[in-house]
Curated annotation (Swiss-Prot):
<comment type="function">
    <text>May have a photoreceptor function. Binds ss- and ds-DNA in a sequence non-specific manner, lacks photolyase activity.</text>
</comment>
<dbReference type="InterPro" id="IPR005101">
    <property type="entry name" value="Cryptochr/Photolyase_FAD-bd"/>
</dbReference>
<keyword id="KW-0238">DNA-binding</keyword>
<keyword id="KW-0934">Plastid</keyword>
<dbReference type="InterPro" id="IPR036155">
    <property type="entry name" value="Crypto/Photolyase_N_sf"/>
</dbReference>
<protein>
    <recommendedName>
        <fullName>Cryptochrome DASH, chloroplastic/mitochondrial</fullName>
    </recommendedName>
</protein>
<feature type="compositionally biased region" description="Gly residues">
    <location>
        <begin position="511"/>
        <end position="525"/>
    </location>
</feature>
<dbReference type="InterPro" id="IPR014133">
    <property type="entry name" value="Cry_DASH"/>
</dbReference>
<dbReference type="GO" id="GO:0000719">
    <property type="term" value="P:photoreactive repair"/>
</dbReference>
<keyword id="KW-0809">Transit peptide</keyword>
<dbReference type="InterPro" id="IPR036134">
    <property type="entry name" value="Crypto/Photolyase_FAD-like_sf"/>
</dbReference>
<keyword id="KW-0150">Chloroplast</keyword>
<dbReference type="GO" id="GO:0009507">
    <property type="term" value="C:chloroplast"/>
</dbReference>
<dbReference type="InterPro" id="IPR014729">
    <property type="entry name" value="Rossmann-like_a/b/a_fold"/>
</dbReference>
<dbReference type="InterPro" id="IPR006050">
    <property type="entry name" value="DNA_photolyase_N"/>
</dbReference>
<keyword id="KW-0274">FAD</keyword>
<dbReference type="InterPro" id="IPR002081">
    <property type="entry name" value="Cryptochrome/DNA_photolyase_1"/>
</dbReference>
């Protein structure tokens, strides 16, 4: 009788609570004392390579947060009597080395199901490498994929999974109506208890190692040094929250937002804020790396509704999590089209590459204060409000006419909550490339509606600290005497091209409630498609971003 090794390949599921792979490993370990469980996480070099447009995909802020998430998981596993093997390199090589090769040995790799091409190709590479290694020694290797990233399980959604979700609506409201009426959120899977995963095998070496920023395969040494600096010293005092990675911090945030601060009760009224830690849940970074599951969040919300209050705010957080699900399933349906310039609708448009405009957008020097404030916050903290994300995406893609994929790349580099499906699906939609009405944001009106006194702008654009609220949307329109008196040193608005949206088959739609297709008050959950165009997907940043 050969040995059995169970490899838990952690990726975007860095938690023990409500983790199907962990639960499956515990079950297998309970069947025989000969079963050994090896949890592993790989900082795969694939994700650190530059994008097709030359930008480093994995930035310093993401590096810091991910290291914290992995370290927290390692600590939790050690508390159970297990451990986490952490490696840098290629997942296929690392996991192949863990494959048993003795006669009649078997290796079972457990991993969370992912939906986008890079991850699924990685799955195939790991599966092939482990099988080849096992066969060389008359052993066997299999991979089990377990669904775990969404609120609704893929086996429960009322769409045809066998056809690649070809019948999934391309607008949110029909999707939401169907899943809410026909799906039940599954119960949260309990976390393992002490010794349920057994002890890691002595034959596997290197459990004591935990990488430093300099060990990660960053695209440059400068990014590694910035990552190290962020770990050692640097919470920007203007940051909305001191984001610390890991399941323990994620669960603490859920507890704080719902039970300790009671802010859930007023979420609907505050969710469009841009300053402070509690205008929204701020769960997005932990959700993106799987430090907390949406099912656990909803389970706690249901308990809150039972014990305290059920209102529009409690529902709205769940509503946002359903948006998150929508983009995950949308990516599964459309595949690599979410990365294509013409988008999922195949719309043709004239895009430009203007390095001056793109650089100004990235550095927050466009001359549009609301845009500049949001972009500076992103660079400094790795976070931006939902409201800000909608505005900066609309400005870059629809006002400046810059290839929207540069914006998606920049977000991928910086966002602590980077999630492939959400980021690329939302940017594709913001650029009008998912079909239907194009939602173009009026930045001056957005400033008036959401930062009328300029409090947020002045927090991040210090050179505007003395500008009166009446001129905060366009400081250079202030009287010369005022500008001279306060020593205003702020760039004029960049001259932008006049866009012809008729070539895209749909004129810009009117804004409603100051938000239109966004996650704010004005977002229609869906709309009637314009004649001659495909159905619309609202330009919305999922969840809990805000």
């Amino acid at each position: 009788m050969g040995r059995t090794r169970v490899v838990i390949w952690f990726r975007n599921d860095l938690r023990l609570l409500d983790n199907a792979c962990v639960a499956r490993a515990a079950t297998l370990a309970s069947e025989s004392s000969d079963v050994e469980v090896v949890p592993v996480y790989v900082f795969d070099e694939t994700y650190f390579k530059p994008s097709k447009r030359g930008l480093a995909r994995f930035g310093a802020g993401r590096g810091k947060f991910t290291l914290e998430c992995v370290g927290d998981l390692k600590t939790s596993l050690r508390a159970l009597g297990s451990d986490l093997l952490v490696r840098c390199g290629k997942s296929r090589d690392v996991i192949a080395e863990l494959t048993l090769t003795g006669a009649n040995d078997r290796t079972i790799i457990l991993t969370q199901t992912e939906v986008t091409s890079e991850e699924t190709e990685m799955d195939v590479a790991v599966e092939r490498a482990t099988r080849e290694r096992a066969r060389g020694g008359a052993a066997s290797a299999t991979m089990e994929r377990h669904w775990g990233s969404t609120l609704y399980h893929i086996d429960d959604v009322p769409f045809d999974v066998t056809s690649g979700l070809s019948d999934l609506p391309d607008v949110f409201t029909p999707f939401r109506n169907k899943v809410e009426s026909k799906c039940k959120v599954r119960d949260v899977i309990p976390a393992p208890t002490a010794n349920e995963l057994g002890h890691v095998p002595a034959s596997v070496e290197g459990f004591e190692w935990m990488p430093k920023p300099s060990d990660l395969p960053f695209a440059s040494s400068e990014i590694a040094m910035d990552c190290d600096k962020r770990i050692k010293d640097c919470l920007d005092e203007r940051s909305v929250l001191d984001f610390k990675g890991g399941e323990s911090n994620a669960l603490a945030r859920v507890k704080y937002y719902l039970w300790e601060s009671d802010r859930l009760a007023t979420y609907f009224e505050t969710r469009n804020g841009m300053l402070g830690g509690d205008y929204s849940t701020k769960l997005a970074p932990w959700l993106a790396l799987g430090c907390v599951s949406p099912r656990h969040v909803v389970s706690e919300i249901r308990r809150y509704e039972s014990e305290r209050v059920e209102n529009k705010s409690t529902y709205w957080v769940i509503f946002e999590l359903i948006w998150r699900d929508f983009f995950k399933f949308f990516a599964l349906k459309h595949g690599n089209k979410i990365f294509h310039l013409d988008g999922t609708a195949g719309r043709r448009a004239s895009w430009k590459r203007d390095e001056k405009i793109l650089k100004a957008w990235k550095t927050g020097t466009t001359g549009y204060p609301l845009i500049d404030a949001n972009m500076r916050e992103l660079a400094a903290t790795g976070f931006m409000s939902n409201r800000g994300r909608q505005n900066v995406a609309s400005w870059l893609a629809l006002d400046a006419g810059i290839d929207w994929r540069h914006g998606a790349d920049w977000f991928e580099h910086h966002l602590l909550d980077y999630d492939t499906a959400s980021n690329w699906g939302n940017w594709c939609a913001a650029a009008g490339m998912t079909g239907g009405r194009i939602n173009r944001f009026n930045i001056a009106k957005q400033t008036k509606d959401y930062d009328p006194a300029g409090e947020y702008i002045k927090t991040w654009v210090k050179e505007l600290a003395e500008v009166p609220a009446a001129y905060i949307a366009d400081p250079n329109q202030a009287p010369r005497e005022l500008r001279d008196r306060i020593g205003l040193n702020y760039p004029n608005k960049l001259a932008l091209p006049r866009r012809d949206f008729t070539e895209m088959g749909s004129p810009p739609g009117p804004r409603r409630g100051g938000g239109g297709g966004g996650r704010g008050r004005g977002r229609p959950g869906g709309s009637t498609p314009n004649r001659g165009t495909k159905a619309r997907v609202a330009s919305v940043y999922d969840t809990v971003y805000g």
